[in-house]
């Protein structure tokens, strides 16, 4: 989109809510969060205690909350302070077998503190942003391309804190962040509802088929 008065290329999206104007600013991720690698506790500490965020929690949830974290670990003095994850923090996949998957991100949306593992990098919030906007932003094709080029490795690909901190993205005001995120959340909710309906209909079809053909089950 161009400004006809000055022939200046404006840094604005092609599709936008009408109440917003002005350019999106380019920021490195380090302006919004500080990065840290996760903890590597002994195996005997697993299975009890504080919830422990792993790569699977990043990949398998729309967002991460305390109750859907799979693993637990017994923490020792200083672990919560050093490796604690709080509401709005972003979690990144540090290592992957494929370059395309390295640096995938999710957001923690819970008031209960958790900790995170060694194959995860935490982006600790240090500036005001709308957490779910960053969840969607970091999954966008543009962001993924910028993150992937920071990955390195041969058989196994990794991304580091320094690489993530230098990823630069176009960021709107927090008011526009919230508006965009709520639209995407609404769409995700509709998708989840439709998927439940599809699952029920498929179950109904299986039940009808079983009832229709049960009497022929012993025939050859």
Q: Where is each model-derived feature located?
A:
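Short, solvent-exposed loop/turn positions at domain surfaces
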Residues: 3, 40, 78-79, 109, ...
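Amphipathic alpha-helical segments
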Residues: 6-11, 17-27, 134, 168-207
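A short glycine-rich beta-alpha junction/loop motif
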Residues: 9, 13, 40, 113-119, ...
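Non-catalytic DNA-recognition/assembly elements of restriction-modification systems
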Residues: 14-39, 166, 219-220
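Sequence-specific dsDNA recognition surfaces
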Residues: 30-42, 57-89
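Short, ligand-facing micro-motifs at secondary-structure edges
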Residues: 59-71, 90-116, 132-136, 145-149
